[in-house]
Amino acid sequence: RFKKIRRLGALPGLTSKRPRSGSDLKNQLRSGKRSQYRIRLEEKQKLRFHYGLTERQLLKYVHIAGKAKGSTGQVLLQLLEMRLDNILFRLGMASTIPGARQLVNHRHILVNGRIVDIPSYRCKPRDIITTKDKERSKVLIQNYIASSPHEELPNHLTIDPLQYKGLVNQIIDSKWVGLKIN
């Protein structure tokens, strides 16, 4: 993971750890003129590694975004940000996106009162995201919320930390995307 972070820059969803600062010297020696191909490839890889997507999943999202009205890049980021695993990460219910994927896969998360075990589930406005009533699920989420640094919550989400409940208010604005994409 650190190799990816050193090569591509900050990927907040991949891991909460940070590489040592002395490793940037190698990158400065290697950096020369970056071709258009390299720039595009790095931006694509940033998206893949940050959101934990396979090549095929990313291609499907690009295809959907291309058919939609508006800027393809903005629509693509909106689609990726409205995934259930990413919303759990943004709410602070998981420290990383892979951690959020694990919570969803292990059936700890309910959307509108129903168990959802698909991390790529596309959330819609007015979806209510809660934890299962089991004690183990609540303890897991409580630990994540307590240990995570309290960052500013995006406008499109609200959280009730006492009831372990999150609400999707609207589709995300482009300024709230936590990843810098060229």
From Swiss-Prot:
It comes from the Eukaryota. Its main location: plastid. One of its GO terms (molecular function) is structural constituent of ribosome. It is found in: Plastid, Chloroplast. Pfam families: Ribosomal_S4, S4. Part of the 30S ribosomal subunit. Contacts protein S5. The interaction surface between S4 and S5 is involved in control of translational fidelity. HAMAP family: Ribosomal_uS4_B (MF_01306_B). This is Small ribosomal subunit protein uS4c. It comes from Neomarica sp. (strain Lejeune 1997). The gene is rps4.
